[in-house]
Amino acid sequence: MFTVFLLVVLATTVVSFPSDRESDGANDEARTDEPEEHGPDRNGCCRNPACESHRCG
């Protein structure tokens, strides 16, 4: 009976460890180093279609 208990504890411990496989990004924090899409860029142009001011083509 004790052997079965140890086997269950070991199995749940192994399952609970994070895998070394590549992540799909679901748990990653939002990146802040990318440029803001809804504000004017360094030329003063807004690339967002919903932006009414500072449109540059």
UniProtKB/Swiss-Prot annotation:
Pfam families: Toxin_8 (PF07365). GO terms for cellular component: extracellular region; host cell postsynaptic membrane. The modification Cysteine amide is found at C56. The cysteine framework is I (CC-C-C). Alpha3/5 pattern. Residues 19-41 have a biased composition (Basic and acidic residues). Its main location: secreted. Residues 17-42 form a propeptide. Keywords: Acetylcholine receptor inhibiting toxin, Amidation, Disulfide bond, Neurotoxin, Postsynaptic neurotoxin, Secreted, Signal, Toxin. It comes from the Eukaryota. Belongs to the conotoxin A superfamily. It comes from Conus stercusmuscarum (Fly-specked cone). The keyword Disulfide bond applies. Residues 1-16 form the signal peptide. One of its GO terms (molecular function) is acetylcholine receptor inhibitor activity. It is found in: Secreted. Disulfide bonds join C45-C51, C46-C56. Alpha-conotoxins act on postsynaptic membranes, they bind to the nicotinic acetylcholine receptors (nAChR) and thus inhibit them. Residues 17-46 are annotated as: Disordered. This is Alpha-conotoxin-like Sm1.2.
